[in-house]
Amino acid sequence: MHIPDNYLSPATCGTLVTAMAPVWTVAVLKVKVQIKKHHETLPMLGIAASLAFLIMMFNLPIPGGTTAHAVGGTLLAVLIGPWAACLALTVTLLLQALLFGDGGILAFGANALNMAVIMPFVGYACYRLGQKWHHEKLGLAIGAYLGINMAALVAGIELGLQPILAHTASGAPLYCPYGLNITIPAMLTAHLLVAGWVEVVFTLLVFQFVKRVAPTNLYQTPTRRNQRPWIALLLGLAVLSPLGLLASNTAWGEWSPQELQQRLAQQHISTHAPQGMVHGFHFQALFSDYAIAGLPVSVGYILSAITAVLIFLLLIRGLQHETDTSQH
């Protein structure tokens, strides 16, 4: 689901990040109002971002030799509201790209549109319909499933349009080499068959956990929120995160230029990777692929998870201190 750099043309990336700018602006304004009404929203933003980050570390094997993962977009929308979920997921995606090389820097707008807008808003709309019809959990499950699959569909469209939008004079693709007839089925198959159902399971389990141990931690409950169950949940997920390493293959559409070149050669499509990808923007993250030099992969994975959680919580603590200071 995380589109790397050089799979989308610079024009596509620029268009999508420009389209996201007003969405982020509205989200910030909406969340500021929400925080004024319910101060507990601010610390929950850090918890929500941490939760999404950890959920996305659990990669799953997909038939055909690729992987996929859940995201938690609908879950976050139910916990803190869709606009706050948009911001939490945006910050999560930004940290993943900058620190861990998961998702592109230039493709950040595309990934934010898919996972921080489409997923939480589609999922939350289904959840609210379920509530209206007195089938809360059913609405939540449908929202989680539809949300991630709608995001996958849009990602497939973004990738599949590239051979049409950006190509050489001879018609060779400059960026993603696969057309819509390949990208859409590839993205949807992985999410319809596997990732969508795991998204449902994660969403229902955490929702049930919250309803049981901290029912005030839901968006529509304007009472003081207990953070202790969340800290326990986050620590548990961080410790279990190396399970995501069991699926070692690369997710569809996230290959390096070298991996893509091998695939294209095996499929008798081309003997080289697209030129725009080979000569495009390349960013080396500090802890690329959640690995820390000199440490076992599983240990690096856990430390990456804990580092991300600490960054989110410290960031929110700083914002909370600044908010409290300005109010006094």
UniProtKB/Swiss-Prot annotation:
Induction: Induced by L-lactate but not by a racemic mixture of DL-lactate. Makes part of the larR(MN)QO operon. Its main location: membrane. It holds the Pfam family CbiM. Signal peptide: none annotated. GO terms for cellular component: plasma membrane. It comes from the Bacteria. This is Probable fused nickel transport protein LarMN. It comes from Lactiplantibacillus plantarum (strain ATCC BAA-793 / NCIMB 8826 / WCFS1) (Lactobacillus plantarum).
